[in-house]
Amino acid sequence: FLRF
């Protein structure tokens, strides 16, 4: 995802 965006951070993961």
Curated annotation (Swiss-Prot):
UniProt keyword list: Amidation, Neuropeptide, Secreted
Modified sites of kind Phenylalanine amide: 4
Subcellular location: Secreted
Top-level taxon of the source organism: Eukaryota
Signal peptide stretch: none
GO CC terms, sorted: extracellular region
A Gene Ontology biological process term: neuropeptide signaling pathway
Family: Belongs to the FARP (FMRFamide related peptide) family.
Name the UniProt record assigns to this protein: FLRFamide
